[in-house]
């Protein structure tokens, strides 16, 4: 998709989107004749109504922003000091949580309680919703004119080609929710009773830049924009592109209300819904959206969590690698567990620093999610928690959490081209230049004495080898000298709790057998019935750390007992993240 079309999608999500930019910068303007939309009504966090709508494209009205003090712009006046003072959208409790002084990976229930982030089902909207912002102006009507109403238009771009219109009254102020983080371009339109209008110049009001941009989406809790955060590389994640939300029947009984539908369709302009719950009953099914069901397992057998959901994670990444699918919202039921897993993978891939990845996960505790969630805490005592997923990623080689996430995704069969596409779509400013630190051998490229199979079944990788006793797969490539992590991504149906995985397989380098340091049993490695529909349990497994000399080498993985489906065989440079 061309850049102008990409911007169209961003503009269409204007009310609940935005991007924090430096005060000295202006977003690129766009004049493509954006279509008109009907006015809509949405609630703010205090329960009153503000009506909006009409994605009005004014095209290139790039009036200078003006200086400080009280400024007169024709009949309009604005307090520049007020406009340039960032407004806060987070409540006191939310802000205190976001400024927590300790690593979020070690946060406790007591810590969360101190912020009133209890996750209790009794939490009200005032706990999770953002605060409203207010913009004031002065206006003197020309002689003989009577103001019938004001309209307030704002957007991310300096020409307001992405503008979202809020229908006001005759009051010379507007209060509303879901502004952008950072700079918001706006103008005011005075509508006179005789049908004529007068417009103010385009100005800027500011909102505090601290993410997340939590959202007021009708009666749906736990909603926020994935954008607005800085990355390891120095860029910033675009807002208005990916949203994490709850699903329909989020409390097992309530359907989303009309305000929620309005926000999602008329304001966010969502095009694609990804349901990562385990039931279509949580589908929102908005008119005009494409629904992708990527049902993820959670709870039950909580081992090899990342890999047992690998097929579904790849499905999510495939959706995000297609620009035509944006804006996207994804959810499970309450937007915390499976949604949290997905959020960790997306934030990690995009280069959000590790501490902020966990911070975003924990922000869900301001919503009624049944009970608290934090690393090490198992929801409903089901034996699963986000820490198991994160620890699998942290075990991968990489200089930081982004590289570790990238390599983990490669190891479960994601294509590097698609991962890079997602990074490019979602990043503004400096983009991460991730170089694969090793060789990933997909099933289609491996040499094998096993039975090669190509499958469109979601239970298996697209191409894999079925290897039983005496069968093998091998990868021959040129390597740089140094320590390497050898990783195999495979599935198996045997979930024996005492049989060691290392006793069932063999690893050779140039024909010489190697010691496998992995000490997991087949059960703890995640094999067997660990996903829905009795699917085979896929996992990635680090076999160990090995030293290679520079030049060509052949890595061979073979089966001594049992049967395994081999999806990838990967060799990564051994890199330990010094800091996340």
Q: Where in the sequence are the language-model features?
A:
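Conserved structural position at the C-terminal beta-strand
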Residues: 190, 557-559
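Beta-strand-rich ligand-recognition modules
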Residues: 491-552, 559-574
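Sec-dependent bacterial lipoprotein signal peptides
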Residues: 1-17
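Cys-dependent protein tyrosine phosphatase-like superfamily
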Residues: 69-328, 341-437
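Extended extracellular/luminal ectodomain segments enriched in beta-structured repeat modules
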Residues: 480-489
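Ser/Thr/Gly/Pro-rich low-complexity, disordered linker/stalk segments of secreted
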Residues: 23-73, 449
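Glycan-recognition and processing domains
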Residues: 20-30, 74-110, 432-480, 569-580
